[in-house]
Amino acid sequence: MSSHKTFTIKRFLAKKQKQNRPIPQWIQMKPGSKIRYNSKRRHWRRTKLGL
């Protein structure tokens, strides 16, 4: 990735960075919650974004 990015690319990367985090613990603690983990986590080496 180049150091000179367009704003569109930068915004896209920022969104992906925010999405790539575990679910909050309080969501797991909710009664009847079936969500155990964030199934859409992405590892920087294994799966690329396709830019």
UniProtKB/Swiss-Prot annotation:
Q: In which tissues is it expressed?
A: Testis specific.
Q: Where is the signal peptide?
A: none
Picking any one GO molecular function of the record gives: structural constituent of ribosome
Q: What is its main location?
A: cytoplasm
Report the Pfam families cross-referenced here.
Ribosomal_L39
**Family annotation (PROSITE patterns):** RIBOSOMAL_L39E
Q: Which GO terms describe its biological process?
A: spermatogenesis; translation
Name the domain of life.
Answer: Eukaryota
- Keyword Nuclease in record: no
Q: Where does the UniProt annotation locate this protein?
A: Cytoplasm
One cellular component term (GO) for this entry is:
cytosolic large ribosomal subunit
Kindly state which keywords UniProt assigns to this record, in alphabetical order. Answer: Cytoplasm, Ribonucleoprotein, Ribosomal protein
Q: Which HAMAP family match?
A: Ribosomal_eL39
Subunit comment for this entry?
Component of a male germ cell-specific 60S large ribosomal subunit (LSU), which contains RPL10L and RPL39L, instead of RPL10 and RPL39 paralogs. The composition of the rest of the complex is similar to classical ribosomes.
Family membership, please give it.
Answer: Belongs to the eukaryotic ribosomal protein eL39 family.
Which PANTHER family does this chain map to?
RIBOSOMAL PROTEIN EL39-LIKE 2, RIBOSOMAL PROTEIN L39E
Function summary: Male germ cell-specific component of the ribosome, which is required for the formation of sperm and male fertility. Replaces the RPL39 paralog in the ribosome of male germ cells. The ribosome is a large ribonucleoprotein complex responsible for the synthesis of proteins in the cell. The male germ cell-specific ribosome displays a ribosomal polypeptide exit tunnel of distinct size and charge states compared with the classical ribosome. It is responsible for regulating the biosynthesis and folding of a subset of male germ-cell-specific proteins that are essential for the formation of sperm.
| Protein name (record) | Ribosomal protein eL39-like 2
What is the scientific name of the source organism? Homo sapiens (Human)
Report which gene this protein is encoded by: RPL39L
